Amino acid sequence: MIDAQEDIRTDTVEITFPAGLPGFPHAHRFQLTPWGETSTPFSLMSSMDDSDVGFVVVEPWVFYPDYEFDLDTATSQRLAISEPNDSLVLCVVTLGEQPEDATVNMLGPIVINRFTREACQAVLDPSLFNVRAPLTPRGI
């Protein structure tokens, strides 16, 4: 039996955004690859449709353990997510000139169905979440 949860975090896998990404509607297929050492929480999400499109992503709970949100019904249905464990949530990291300048987009998490590997970028309530939350490593 394949452990979809472990595979998607430790191996290079292909994920698909059927509707594209906001700002990149032409980019549908991405490779998600662990970035750096195996113990790092970061991954690279590189477009297979446009080599100029790529992002550093991270599981938000590494830096914000209390981060939680309700996925709207339409997104849950579109991705066939019925249980929270059916999904992997990643947030886009913006690197700064200095490591302490890095930020993470908590407003627009990327939600991936662990089994089908279909994904979308959710847009949450801007009064509750920050598009440029500080990314301050804690013991990493």
Regions found by a protein language model. Name each.
Residues T73-E83:
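Short active-site loop/helix that positions an aromatic residue
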Residues M1-D66, P84-I140:
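Long, compositionally biased stretches
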Residues D70:
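Short aromatic/basic micro-patch
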